[in-house]
Amino acid sequence: MEKSGLVAKEGYPFMAIFIGVAAVSSALSWYGIVQFVLWVLAGWCIWFFRDPERHSDAPEDAVIAPADGRVVAIREMEKGPLTDEPVRMVSIFMNVFNVHVNRAPIAGTVTKISYHPGKFVNADLDKASIENERNVLLMESPAGVKMAFQQVAGLVARRIVCRINEGTVLQRGERFGLIRFGSRVDLFFPMDAEISVKLGEMTHSGVTQMGRLKGKES
């Protein structure tokens, strides 16, 4: 699994800017309140891009949370993204205080990635899943089960980062990207899968068990 430092590498440019401006304010002896605010913003930026190690002891067939946040939707759909089969969608909303690094919900091969430009409405709203900028990924597990999930940009988030390509093999819980400054991740479960979470439940990426998949019948 990919190793990471204390913060996600995508945050380095932002941290450099905030820390640089704060340092200049101190060197030039700007007003104390200005220096304080700038250093607070620099600290918040570092905290926002934090990337803690996560481990899960969930069963092998379990689907784990791809993101920190709150479950804001659980509903059935006649057709899932990148497949023609009905699915049950579980949506996780990430606010600006959550860890924003995204992790693979299952182990397997990324068979397709599809980027869709779009709007930037509040990611807490259901319509964000179909109207907003989003990046859809389809994975196939070692048992032959296909599962899609998508990164959705939000009102503040205007940048989806996906570090992988089609054909990439991921371990469950492995980092694959992030979304900057508040966003949403949707999971699309096969209809025969078990869902373990409820509306309003808080999730931790790489840890929380979202449900369980059934192996493909021979």
Swiss-Prot record:
UniProt pathway: Phospholipid metabolism; phosphatidylethanolamine biosynthesis; phosphatidylethanolamine from CDP-diacylglycerol: step 2/2
Cofactor detail note: Binds 1 pyruvoyl group covalently per subunit.
The keyword Lipid biosynthesis appears for this protein: yes
UniProt record, GO biological process: phosphatidylethanolamine biosynthetic process
InterPro entries: PS_Dcarbxylase, PSD-A
Keyword line: Cell membrane, Decarboxylase, Lipid biosynthesis, Lipid metabolism, Lyase, Membrane, Phospholipid biosynthesis, Phospholipid metabolism, Pyruvate, Zymogen
Any single GO CC term annotated in Swiss-Prot or TrEMBL for this entry: plasma membrane
Catalytic center residues: 183 (schiff-base intermediate with substrate)
Membrane-topology descriptor: Peripheral membrane protein
Domain of life: Bacteria
Cofactor(s) the record lists: pyruvate
Family: Belongs to the phosphatidylserine decarboxylase family. PSD-A subfamily.
Oligomeric form and interacting partners: Heterodimer of a large membrane-associated beta subunit and a small pyruvoyl-containing alpha subunit.
Protein name: Phosphatidylserine decarboxylase proenzyme
